[in-house]
């Protein structure tokens, strides 16, 4: 009985351990980590800098049943400012419906004789991508584990500002898994 309790405790502990510590040097120097998106704002916050990295070895296809796809990967967000230098590690799970890719929507609009304005309006509201971000860890730039106080979130991924970062990350995951951009897939 006691052995069973220890085994269950070990299994529970294994699933609550945060992701492996990582430093900014490792993100910058290892070919395993690909820069997805980079932001240096203009104006009053020009001293801030954020870079998102994809751990290319973490990419896992969870669902492949055309037109539906689901991909999981680890994404690191390195944020640097005069006040703080921190790396956030998140597990991303993105669901894709290629019937709503831009190419699919344009194809169907052409078949129906719809106007370009109609296609643009539909494409802005129906992206075909939904993402879940689950925090794995938070680290200083030298790799020290920091406390995390964020819950997982699931939301639609849109093509327009201000959420282009999430869109670019989701498109990069699709590209890394299938060597084509999500928007280029046509479902007739």
Placement of each model-derived feature along the sequence:
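Sec-dependent signal peptide recognition
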Residues: 2-8
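Homeobox/homeodomain signature
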Residues: 5, 17-18, 23
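Bacterial N-terminal signal peptides
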Residues: 8-16
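N-terminal secretory-pathway/extracellular module detecting exported/lumenal segments
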Residues: 21-90, 97-188
